């Protein structure tokens, strides 16, 4: 970590060196210029430093101060009372406030009674100023590395001694309360005007002269340009810092009696403005820089008015305490009431000088902010003792906290997917083949049941019946095979012994059985082939034929019909006894002509065939035979023959 350096204090001008007596040491310690508080945690620090005053919360609107009447509140200037007078109007204050403040400064330069009291006032607490200075140096050295909090913590250290001095002076107490309330409501510096103090004390001119001497130590017109350059460029502290501090204190007493010219006032005013601009570059908050710029613009136009008023009122040349006018207007532009006593006017002028001192000390603090312990000690010795640090508290006011900027939302960067690198050796054909292998095979469609059965019929191999082959028992040599062949030629198949079976007969029987079984199995297979005739295409199922037409049976009748009937009939009867037998026999043998004609003629055959019944013919034959019997009654035995021909 780089250690920042503190810029060296600018050298004194020639005019100041000539007027400084080297032998006369400074009789009284110079007052400490109070530092202007920063706006981060100012209210909290002041409440912790002084246990007597509780923290005052912020209020949305400005209210009346404690002990302030309505008439005093109405007499205050509107520009100082409203936020627009300080924030929105570019820091320009009315000329009446500036004239009144300059008049009070002129009145405060007049000698008053009570120089001894003013000399004792910085040491009200009774503490050793050297011890207080060591405490301040330790506090500044511990927090020098933290640039954002060093000023606020220095304020808290100085506020610890504030409470003891406030107990001694009641009028300072009331003013601190009123200024803290105004700062809480405004957020920026506001001014309390016309505050009446019951127990007002006259401030001696010696204290004011001490404050003037602090400002006189600044360079004059001869060193105006080198001061601005050296304030910006940081340099290492010189070894003669202690000697310069002694010479500075000796020169204070001589400068108190030495008046300043109007030209010196203008040059010192310009130097103060340059310092204010350099302070903003080094370490001020944006709000402090804005206030200093606004006040500088408002005060440049009113420089001639200030000088004329000071010369008229004081009757002498203006002193160095009036160089804090640009900051004096910023801190408090007090317009006293017409009926105020001179004691109150002196008090208000004292407060204006203190406010200018506070701003001047703040510039020194901001320049010495990043210093370390070793580099900080020679420059802090140049400041006055810490006895008057409680005076800083009256002008310190809380400031706005510094809000850090919100970090931008960073969009996460998503890395791109790496491209798949194909090796040079692999050709595009091999890549395509590898992709083709990885692809799953296409699934075949499910076939219908008829198509599947049709394919199975062709795929099944035909069963060819093969004759059973009996394995040969053992391996025979060539000699044995030749001997067996010769034996078969001689003996044939061998001689069958009783109880032996002929193997050839057994083989023949087995083959016959297999052929028979194959024929039996083949016959039912042929029948379905015959029955599997090509069927006709069926029509729509809605139009069905009747069963009588569906179940038609075609009968093939033969051309000839066979009929069975009895052709001959023989009857036996007992013959009658007659004497003449021979004559009857001859008559019986005679053939009737009708019978002969019926046999010869084919027409008769046709008629008989057409008539199904033959009972009538039999009757006719019987009648004829009976007639013949009557004729042949004389015969012993009557033999009647009937011949019936049935034609088909």
Swiss-Prot record:
Q: What does this protein do?
A: Involved in mitochondrial migration along actin filaments.
Q: Which family does it belong to?
A: Belongs to the AIM21 family.
What coarse category fits the chief subcellular location reported for this protein? cytoplasm
Q: Which gene encodes it?
A: AIM21
Q: Which Pfam families match?
A: Aim21 (PF11489)
Q: Where is the composition biased (Basic and acidic residues)?
A: 89-128, 154-189, 246-258, 290-309, 378-394, 597-620
Which InterPro entries does the record cross-reference, listed alphabetically? Aim21
Composition-biased stretches, type Acidic residues, lie in 580-595
Could you identify this protein by its name?
A: Altered inheritance of mitochondria protein 21
Q: May I have one GO cellular component term? A: actin cortical patch
UniProt feature, compositional bias: Basic residues: 538-547
Q: Where in the cell is it found?
A: Cytoplasm, Cytoskeleton, Actin patch
Q: Where is the composition biased (Low complexity)?
A: 18-29, 409-433, 623-635
Region named Disordered = 1-479, 511-550, 571-648
Polar residues bias (residue ranges): 347-356, 364-377
Entry keyword set: Cytoplasm, Cytoskeleton
């Amino acid at each position: 970590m780089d250690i920042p350096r503190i810029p060296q204090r600018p050298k004194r001008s020639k005019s100041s060196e000539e007027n400084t007596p080297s032998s006369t040491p400074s009789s009284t310690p110079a007052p400490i210029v109070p530092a202007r508080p920063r706006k981060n945690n100012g209210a909290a620090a002041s409440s912790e430093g002084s246990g007597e005053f509780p923290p005052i919360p912020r209020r949305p609107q400005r209210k009346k101060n404690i002990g302030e009447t309505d008439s005093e509140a109405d007499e205050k200037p509107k520009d100082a009372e409203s936020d627009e007078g300080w924030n929105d109007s570019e820091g320009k204050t009315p000329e009446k406030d500036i004239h009144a403040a300059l008049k009070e400064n002129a009145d405060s330069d007049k000698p008053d009674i009570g120089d001894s009291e003013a000399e004792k006032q910085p040491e009200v607490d009774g503490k050793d100023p050297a011890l207080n200075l060591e405490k301040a140096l330790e506090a500044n050295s511990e927090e020098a590395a933290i640039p954002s909090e060093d000023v606020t913590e220095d304020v808290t250290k100085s506020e610890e001694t504030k409470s003891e001095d406030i107990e001694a002076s009641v009028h300072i107490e009331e003013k601190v309360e009123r200024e803290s309330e105004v700062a809480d409501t405004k957020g920026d510096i506001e001014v309390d005007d016309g505050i009446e103090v019951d127990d007002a004390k006259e401030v001696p001119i010696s204290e004011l002269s001490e404050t003037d001497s602090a400002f006189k130590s600044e360079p004059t017109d001869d060193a105006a340009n080198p001061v601005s350059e050296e304030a910006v460029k940081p340099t290492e502290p010189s070894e003669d810092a202690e000697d310069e501090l002694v010479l500075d204190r000796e020169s204070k007493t001589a400068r108190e009696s030495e008046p300043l010219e109007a030209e010196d006032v203008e040059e010192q005013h310009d130097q103060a403005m340059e310092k204010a601009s350099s302070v903003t570059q080094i370490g001020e908050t944006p709000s402090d820089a804005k206030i200093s710029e606004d006040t500088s613009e408002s005060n440049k136009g009113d420089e001639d008015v200030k000088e004329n008023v000071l010369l008229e009122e004081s009757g002498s040349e203006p002193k160095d305490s009036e160089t804090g006018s640009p900051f004096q207007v910023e801190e408090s532009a007090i317009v006293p009431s017409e009926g105020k006593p001179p004691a109150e006017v002196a008090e208000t002028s004292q407060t204006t000088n203190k406010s200018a001192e506070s701003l001047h000390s703040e510039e020194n603090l901001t320049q010495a902010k990043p210093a370390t312990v070793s580099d900080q000690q020679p420059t802090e010795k140049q400041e006055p003792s810490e006895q008057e640090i409680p005076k800083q508290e009256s002008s310190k006011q809380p400031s706005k906290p510094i809000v850090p900027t919100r970090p931008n939302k960073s969009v996460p960067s998503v890395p791109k997917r790496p491209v798949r690198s194909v090796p040079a050796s692999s050709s595009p054909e091999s890549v395509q083949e590898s992709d083709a292998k990885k692809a799953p095979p296409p699934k075949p469609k499910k076939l219908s049941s008829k198509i599947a059965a049709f394919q199975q019929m062709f795929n099944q191999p035909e069963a060819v019946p093969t004759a059973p082959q009996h394995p040969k028992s053992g391996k025979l040599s060539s000699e044995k095979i030749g001997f067996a062949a010769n034996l078969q030629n001689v003996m044939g198949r061998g001689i069958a012994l009783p109880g032996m079976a002929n193997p050839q007969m057994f083989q023949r029987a087995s083959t016959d059985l297999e052929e028979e079984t194959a024929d039996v199995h083949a016959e039912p297979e042929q029948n379905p082939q015959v029955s599997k005739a090509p069927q006709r295409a069926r029509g729509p199922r809605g139009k069905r034929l009747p069963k009588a037409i569906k179940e038609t049976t075609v009968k093939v009748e033969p051309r000839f019909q066979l009929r069975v009937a009895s052709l001959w009939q023989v009857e036996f009867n007992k013959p009658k006894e007659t004497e003449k037998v021979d004559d009857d026999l001859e008559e019986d043998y005679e053939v009737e002509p009708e019978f002969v004609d019926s046999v010869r003629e084919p027409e008769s055959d046709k008629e008989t065939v057409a008539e199904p019944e033959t009972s009538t013919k039999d009757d006719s034959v019987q009648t004829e035979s009976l007639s013949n019997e009557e004729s042949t009654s004389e015969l012993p035995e009557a033999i009647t023959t009937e011949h019936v021909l049935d034609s088909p």
